[in-house]
Amino acid sequence: MTHQPAFTTPTTPIPDAEHLYIQLLNQLRPVFAQSAPPALIGIHRGGAWLAERLHRDLGLNEPFGTLDISFYRDDYATTGIRTNVKTTQIPFDIENRVVVLCDDILNSGRSVRAALNEIFEFGSSASVQLAVLYDRGG
């Protein structure tokens, strides 16, 4: 999957979220149509709802997983724990599987790095592909 950084300036409007979602959905259709479809995991808050919607719209049979990366963030020591920590749920084996990791916005990559650290606690995936709704180009 290729994503072009989406830079916004005062003269460039922010793209429509539904349009971005349809583009992402269409990019993922062939990925999940393979004989061995990847596992789908969303990062809590923005990526979890995205994974839930993709799961529904792609008509996937296997459940999707969710990650709460609160304890894996590199700023945990300075910001502390959030009061609304969610449960990580990965109801499938990821060993040697391709994983599609969903998040709503990609900026610095810190959330993705934290998610990768947590995913590796569950096993060694074959690869992790990132599916984001919007790339801020940070």
Where are these regions (language model features)?
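PRPP-associated nucleotide enzymes
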Residues: 1-138
